[in-house]
Amino acid sequence: MSDEKTQLIEAFYNFDGDYDGFVSVEEFRGIIRDGLPMTEAEITEFFEAADPNNTGFIDYKAFAAMLYSVDES
C-alpha cells in the first residue's frame, strides 16, 4: 500500500470518530473546527459535494474523491 493511501485511510479514521465506516457531518465539522480554518459555509459546501444524496454521511470512497478533487483545484 502506498504511503499516500495509508495517510488517506488514517485521515478518514481520524474523522470517523465512532469507527462505523462513515463520517457524519457532525464528526466532520468537529475535526475541521479543531484543525483547519474553514468557515461554516465552506464546511457545508465541502460536505454537500461529498454527499450528493444528502444522507448526512460520507464513506471512505467519497472522502477520498473529495480530497483528491480539492488537491487538484
From Swiss-Prot:
Single GO MF descriptor: myosin I binding
Boundaries of every EF-hand domain copy: 3-38, 38-73
Q: Which GO terms describe its cellular component?
A: myosin I complex
**Keyword vocabulary terms for this entry:** Calcium, Metal-binding, Motor protein, Myosin, Repeat
Pfam families reported in the protein's UniProt record? EF-hand_7
InterPro entries named among the record's database cross-references: EF-hand-dom_pair, EF_hand_dom
Residues annotated for Ca(2+) binding in this entry: D16, D18, D20, E27
The record describes its quaternary structure and partners as: Myosin I is a dimer of a heavy and a light chain. Inability to self-assemble into filaments. Interacts with myoB. Does not interact with myoC or myoD.
**Function as written in the Swiss-Prot or TrEMBL entry:** Functions as the light chain for myosin-B. Binds calcium with submicromolar affinity and may sense physiological calcium changes.
Protein's recorded name: Myosin-IB light chain
Which species is this record about? Dictyostelium discoideum (Social amoeba)
Organism classification: Eukaryota, Amoebozoa, Evosea, Eumycetozoa, Dictyostelia
**Per UniProt, what is the name of the gene that codes for the protein in this document?**
mlcB
